[in-house]
Curated annotation (Swiss-Prot):
Coiled coil: none
Organism: Buchnera aphidicola subsp. Schizaphis graminum (strain Sg)
Membrane association type: Peripheral membrane protein
Enzyme class: hydrolase
Matching InterPro entries: EF-4, EFG_III/V, EFG_V-like, EFTu-like_2, G_TR_CS, LepA_C_sf, LepA_CTD, LepA_IV
Residue ranges annotated for the tr-type G domain, each copy included: 6-188
Subcellular location, principal: membrane
UniProt-recorded name of the protein: Elongation factor 4
A Pfam family recorded for this sequence: GTP_EFTU
Source superkingdom: Bacteria
Alphabetically ordered keywords of this record: Cell membrane, GTP-binding, Hydrolase, Membrane, Nucleotide-binding, Protein biosynthesis
Length: 601
C-alpha cells in the first residue's frame, strides 16, 4: 500500500518521569492494534529490565501504527518514545529532530515539573506543534483545570482545550488520536529528490551488526541500495530495512516522511554516528541535514573491578555497552590503589548509575567507582590552557594563573512552603540567584550553581528538604574563575591516587578531615602503625594514626631478669620498624566505596 505523505504524522511524547508516558504509548499501540491483547505487556517500549524496574525510559524507541478515522481514512502514526530524566536530554533532542509535533503529557494530579519545561523549550526551539495532554484524570486528586492554567502560566502554551485522558483506563485515547491528526502537520519532503535520511539512534545487534533508526526527509531508500554516510564518506549496501509496529517488520523500501530501521552490515556504532545523514552513493544529496548537537560527557569517574581477574570481562563489557550508548566515553587507566580499570565519561549521575548497574547485572561484574568529577579549565602563566577531569593530574605548582569550574543553570519548580529550605540549600552549594517567579501553585527558581556541587548529591538533598516535591533541570552555562585546591591522601607517606579530590578552598579542610577520620574507621589494624595524612599544596592539614597490633612477647616471662624483657621488647620494636619499611597497607577495596561516598553521609 502506497502511503500518502498527508496521511503520515511523526510525533514524540514529552513528559516528566512518572507522568504516564510509557503507559500512554502502550494504550496508543493497543488502540491501533499494534499488538494483540495477549502480546501486550506493561511498558512495551521500555525494553530494558532496568527501565521497567526504575520506571524510567532510558533509550528512545520508535513505533509505527495505523489508525482508521470515522471517515475511513487510514493514517500512519510514527511516534518516538523519549526519556524524561534530566540525564537523558540528549535522547530527547534527537527524537524531537525527527518529528513535526510533540505530545506534552502532564500528570493532572501533580502539575508541571522542571524537566517537562526544559524538554518543551527544546521542542518549541525546533518549531514543533505542541499538543497538551492532561493524563491521570481517573485519580481522585486530579485537578485538570488548575494544571491547564499552570501550563499556560509556566510554559506559555494554551491548554484550556487540552485532551483529558487516563492512559491507565484508556479514557480519552480516541479523542487524543483525532487531535494528533488535526494539530500535528504532515511531513514535508520530496521523494524525487536525492536521499536524505537522519540517523536518530543506533544500537548493536549480535547477529545483524549496527541497526540504525532513521527518518527519511527526502527521497527513497530501498534494499540493495548503495548508501553513503555523509560525515565519513564511507559507503555500505542496505541489507535489511523495515519498521517497528512495535514488532520488527521487514520492508522493501522506506520513503520520505517515514521512520524506520536499517541494517547495512556496519560493525562499529561510530561508523553510523547519531545525528548524521545517509544519502544515496550514486545520486548523493548536496547538503547534510541539520541534526542536533553532540553532547559531551559532563562528569567523569573511574570504574575498577573488585577482583583483578575480572578486568578482561570488564573491558569487553564496556565495549559492548558503548555500542548501544554513543554518549559513553571510556579510556584505560592504572591506579596504584585499585589496579587496572577505566576512566569513564557520563552525562550525569543517573547515567553513571545506569551504566554501572547494567555492567554489574548483565555481565556479573563487581565494580568500584571513584567519586565523580567535573572538567576544570586551567590557565597557566604562559597563556596555555588545558582541560582536566582527573583530580590526581591536577597541578599544584605556582605556574597556574587561574582555575575555572563549570557553572550550570538550575531551574527548580517547587511548592511555596519549601522555598526557604531550598534557597538555603542553593546558597550552601555556592549558588547565585538569577530569578524567582511565583505561579498559582508553584514557585519557579533559577540559580547558577557550580556543577561540582550539583553532581555530588544536590538532587538527593533537594528532594530531602522539599519532601520530594521539588523538581530540577540543569544545563551547562559557562566556566567561572574560582579558587580550587587539590586534597591528597597519604598512607605511610605514599599518595593514594584514587582518593585525590578537588575541593573549593573554603570547604577543603573539613573535607580532608572527614576523609582521614573515615579511613581510620575503615582500614583494619596491621602489625605496624599506619599514618594517614591529608595534604593541600604539600602542607599537612589533617592527620591520624592507626595503632599497631602488638603481641605480648613478655607473656612467657613470668619473673626473671629485666634485661631479658628489654631484649625481647627491643627485638619486637626492630621487627616492627623493618615491617613498616617493607609492609604494604592492606586496604579493603570495599572501604573505598564508603570513603568516596563521604559527601553523602
Amino acid at each position: 500500500m502506497v502511503k500518502k505523505m498527508k496521511n503520515i504524522r511523526n510525533f514524540s511524547i514529552i513528559a516528566h518521569i512518572d507522568h504516564g508516558k510509557s503507559t500512554l504509548s502502550d494504550r496508543l499501540i493497543q488502540k491501533c492494534g499494534g499488538l494483540s491483547e495477549r502480546e501486550m505487556s506493561d511498558q512495551v517500549l521500555d525494553s530494558m529490565d532496568l527501565e521497567k524496574e526504575r520506571g524510567i525510559t532510558i533509550k528512545a524507541q520508535s513505533v509505527m501504527i495505523d489508525y482508521k478515522d470515522k471517515n475511513g481514512n487510514v493514517f500512519h502514526l510514527n511516534f518516538i518514545d523519549t526519556p524524561g530524566h534530566v540525564n537523558f536530554s540528549y535522547e530527547v533532542s534527537r527524537s524531537l529532530a525527527a518529528c513535526e509535533g510533540a505530545l506534552l503529557v502532564v500528570d493532572s494530579s501533580q502539575g508541571v515539573e522542571a524537566q517537562t519545561l526544559a524538554n518543551c523549550a527544546t521542542a518549541l526551539e525546533m518549531k514543533l506543534s505542541i499538543v497538551p495532554v492532561l493524563n491521570k484524570i481517573d485519580l481522585p486528586n486530579s485537578n485538570p483545570e488548575k494544571v491547564a492554567r499552570e501550563i499556560k502560566e509556566i510554559i506559555g502554551i494554551s491548554a484550556l482545550d487540552a485532551i483529558r485522558c487516563s492512559a491507565k483506563t484508556g479514557q480519552g485515547i480516541e479523542e487524543l488520536i483525532e487531535q494528533i491528526i488535526k494539530k500535528i502537520p504532515a511531513p514535508d519532503g520530496d521523494e524525487k529528490k536525492p536521499l536524505q535520511a537522519l540517523i536518530i539512534d543506533s544500537w548493536f545487534d549480535n547477529y545483524l551488526g549496527v541497526v540504525s533508526l532513521i527518518r527519511i526527509k527526502n527521497g527513497i531508500i530501498s534494499k540493495k541500495d548503495k548508501i553513503k554516510v555523509m560525515s565519513t564518506g564511507k559507503t555500505y549496501f542496505v541489507d535489511h530495512l523495515g519498521i517497528f509496529t512495535p514488532k520488527k517488520i521487514n520492508k522493501n523500501y522506506l520513503k520520505c516522511g517515514e521512520v524506520g530501521w536499517i541494517v547495512c552490515g556496519i560493525k562499529n556504532i561510530s561508523a553510523a554516528p547519531v545525528g548524521d545523514t545517509l544519502t544515496n552513493a550514486k545520486n548523493p544529496a548536496m547538503n547534510m541535514l541539520t541534526g542536533f548537537k553532540k553532547i559531551k560527557p559532563q562528569i567523569y569517574a573511574g570504574l575498577f573491578p573488585v577482583t583483578s581477574d575480572q578486568y578482561e570481562i570488564f573491558r569487553d563489557a564496556l565495549g559492548k555497552l558503548s555500542l548501544n550508548d554513543s554518549s559513553l566515553f571510556y579510556e584505560p587507566i592504572n591506579s596504584t590503589a585499585l589496579g587496572f580499570g577505566f576512566r569513564c565519561g557520563f552525562l550525569g549521575l543517573l547515567h553513571m548509575e545506569i551504566v554501572q548497574a547494567r555492567l554489574e547485572r548483565e555481565y556479573s561484574l563487581n565494580l568500584i567507582s571513584t567519586a565523580p568529577n567535573v572538567i576544570y579549565q586551567i590557565e597557566f602563566n604562559n597563556g596555555e590552557k588545558i582541560y582536566l577531569d582527573t583530580p590526581s593530574n591536577f597541578p599544584v605548582d605556582n605556574k597556574i594563573r587561574k582555575i575555572k569550574e563549570p557553572i550550570v543553570e538550575c531551574n527548580i519548580l517547587l511548592p511555596p512552603k519549601f522555598l526557604g529550605p531550598v534557597m538555603k540549600l542553593c546558597i550552601k552549594k555556592r549558588g547565585t540567584e538569577i530569578n524567582m517567579i511565583y505561579h498559582e501553585q508553584q514557585v519557579s527558581l533559577k540559580y547558577h550553581i557550580p556543577m561540582n556541587e550539583v553532581v555530588l548529591n544536590f538532587f538527593d538533598e533537594l528532594k530531602s528538604v522539599s519532601s520530594g516535591y521539588a523538581s530540577l533541570e540543569y544545563d551547562f552555562k559557562y566556566f567561572k574563575t574560582v579558587k580550587m585546591v587539590r586534597i591528597d591522601i597519604l598512607i605511610n607517606s605514599e599518595r593514594v591516587d584514587a582518593l585525590t579530590v578537588i575541593s573549593y578552598y573554603k570547604n577543603a579542610q573539613n573535607r580532608a578531615r572527614e576523609i582521614v577520620n573515615k579511613m581510620k574507621e575503615l582500614i583494619p589494624r596491621h602489625q605496624f602503625d599506619i599514618n594517614i595524612q591529608a595534604t593541600i599544596n604539600n602542607s599537612i592539614v589533617a592527620r591520624s594514626t592507626i595503632k599497631q597490633l602488638r603481641k605480648n612477647v613478655l607473656a612467657k616471662c613470668y619473673g626473671g631478669d629485666i634485661s631479658r624483657k628489654k631484649k625481647l621488647l627491643k627485638k619486637q620494636k626492630d621487627g616492627k620498624k623493618r615491617m613498616k619499611k617493607i609492609g604494604n597497607v592492606n586496604m579493603p577495596k570495599t572501604a573505598f566505596l564508603d570513603i568516596l561516598n563521604i559527601h553523602k553521609d
